[in-house]
Amino acid sequence: MSIQSIVTKETLKKKDTNIEIQEKNMNDLVESASRVIAPLWPISTFAAHHPWMGLEKQSFEQVANWLKEARNVDIYPSASMIHSAKAKGEIEESFLQIGLSRWLDSQSFHIPRETAERFCQEALKLERLPSSLLSSPELNKLAEEISYINTGSMEDSSMQPISSLIENQKGDNLSDVLNYHIIKWCKLYLDDSGSSWTMPNREKGLYRAWHHLITFDPALSKNERKVLKDWPQDAQGALTKALSELGIPESNRQAYLEGHLLSLPGWAGMIRWRSQQSIKEQALVIEYLAVRISMELAIVKPYLPLKNQKAEKKVSIVPLIASWIYWGDISTREWLQMSATEQSELLAFAYRFDENTRKKLWLEAWEQTHAEQLKKKISSKQRATNDKKRVVAQLAFCIDVRSEPFRRHLEKLGPFETFGIAGFFGLPIATSELGSNNSHPSLPVILKPKHQIKELADENEYKSYEQRKKIDSSVSYTFKTMKKNVLTSMLLPEVSGPLLGLQMITRSFVPRRVGGFIRNLRKNMLQKPNTTFSLNHVHDTKCEIPIGFTKEEKVNYVRQALKMVGLTEKFAPLVVMCGHSSQSTNNPYAAALECGACGGAAGGFNARVFATLCNLPEVREALSAEGIKIPEDTIFAAAEHKTTVDELDWIYVPELSEAAQEAFDNIESVMPNVSQEANRERLTQLPNFKMKIKNPSKEAHRFAEDWSEIRPEWGLARNASFIIGQRELTQDCDLEGRAFLHNYDWKQDENGDILASIIAGPGTVAQWINLQYYASTVAPHYYGSGNKTTQTVTAGLGVMQGNASDLLSGLPWQSVMQSDSETYHSPLRLLIVIQAPTKYIERLLNNDFTFREKVQNGWVRLASVDSEGRWKNW
């Protein structure tokens, strides 16, 4: 089964077109094929993405079966993961039995139900068939005497690259040889920061630059270079010619392109991301495929034509018979006594109840157990909303799962109310920090910025700050320049050795003290002056996006965010907008620990901009006219939650009213205890950390500053649910840092627009994060990025294992694994729980086709809690 057969009906229409039409539609063909890979962002702005985002029109089960066939990639949890989860009480057997019964009811078979159930029960133990049984002469002789099952013949339509079917004289698979060449060209073209001597003609595009150099490539043989000597000048022509000379039928070309894209999904993903960033490179995926398949032709041409380029693949009945012998307790003698019809029925049943089906039932039981446990946690807390304590401060945190423990401990220690909101606070902005010539899109990667906000300072103070920055940057620039120069690179070790040697020793043995000293030194040296923002709209034709906001836009963004969390009345004297950031050393994945809603950056900038907008008199007056009355003595401030050390760093505190100052002092007084408790809870979950922690905060700082620490924090591992509702629904619940929490009051959302926005924005971000962790756990060899300790940071783009691997797209082993054999992250698809009446959910599903498709196809799970507290699974 090819993904071509399940992606779209458009693809099927192209099967009968001739070569001229095929060439004309090459853009469409490549675009359709590109759905099998996901765009890969550079590691410096690591953005959560899930690798199957282009395949959500198919069910999770269909994609799982296709990947198993096409790439031998299993995206269901392994047997060891399932057994471990069951041993820890994460899977209830009753849910597995319900799932099995439902599956049997959906199947058509003509064997006794009791026989089928007995077979399935044994098969669900997930034991491997003994190799001695599979290789036994008796079994193989029996298989020869039995004809193939009628439905067992299937065509392998996944169209593996021809190079993967051939080995050279050295025994090397030619697909590995091809990958080696393609990795080299990708590194040369995509390198933005590593080399001082860039690829010639790079500005003309990948294909033109490659075409200019390929005939001089010493890594190719004379005959291989000869094939490419008079090759077409344009990528589309080259791709069409290569496919034709390889003998790929027009009806199979999309499947063939898919096979090549999946051969190096990391590099192909980076190519696809680049193609989406500018019009200049929008044809980059076609260029990549043209280079790859042209080189494939040059490498495999001596071996063409192949006799069995696309052979029919038959289902071996040996493991099917063995499964009935081992799990169904049917002897070989009993097999021989059966009629051909009975044999065919048994084999067909075993074929349908394959490994993927068994693991699917286990995964669903695991997910249902989690949902039931979450339901019990929520329903066990009977809260009296009319008995609320007096609130002196309200704090809005990002929905990030790491906020949940911090919020829980903060609420326990004082009269505080917390809210959950996407960490960009609904501001579609690109941020430009003081002195920076570049801007960073500080919003979810699924959105595009509409405004640019610049950080500004007094001219004299800014000049002083710039001078200090230049001194700091000149040191690193000089070091980098000397390292790349032929002559000075030999002198560099002598010059820098003593200083770097001292740094290595001190950072290795006293990391917390030295790291803190260096951090404070840089902080003092590069202390920013007092800054403001370019909040007012400026029409600048030189900028791609406008600077600042109009008055209407200011009011609109504040109104939207306040309504989204239900904060439109009963304002506390102090309202704190809390972005979040991480703190780690020598960590290429630092951006993965930052705010996903801010495009892999810290959320403090957005928090400060939003708080500043809320304090503007013009904004408050306009909101008051609409019925959102913010008291004069209510002050908005901004802070940053540092997730690695669980501290709150104040970044914007304007002049406070008396009541707001009292609230501020109250927060400050409890914050050390909040940090201690949150750090204690978090640190005990780290592997090999079973000792009693005397000073959790001190230990957390050591993890953050230790440059040999491969796991400064767990990040968003174990995320499993996204709860959309009022805080009373989850207050006092220990959700174990596994839930994204977004405030929502359905009573303030009569038309459902707020709920739709939450699902389309934060809901999508949470789903991408969830499935990225899922994929990196179940298939780390394909969707993960291996061990941090052996990674190589490449061209400022990402990481590789060694210098000739795929660009690794997922999370490292240390982000999801407790040990070599034990996972920390539970690979469950995201459960979205919405607190709203049933009619709200029905309206959402009717209006949002994309979300309905995700639910129906098994990419997310959905449940709701109505006004009476009744839980419903959708």
Swiss-Prot record:
Residues the record lists as binding Zn(2+): C398, D400, H580, C595
Xref: Pfam families: DabA
Membrane topology recorded in Swiss-Prot or TrEMBL: Peripheral membrane protein
Family, similarity comment: Belongs to the inorganic carbon transporter (TC 9.A.2) DabA family.
Localization terms from the record: Cell membrane
Name assigned to this protein: Probable inorganic carbon transporter subunit DabA
Major localization listed first in the record, in broad terms: membrane
UniProt function note: Part of an energy-coupled inorganic carbon pump.
Cofactor needs: Zn(2+)
Record's keyword terms, sorted: Cell membrane, Membrane, Metal-binding, Transport, Zinc
One annotated GO molecular function: zinc ion binding
Quaternary data: Forms a complex with DabB.
Any GO CC annotation of this UniProt entry: plasma membrane
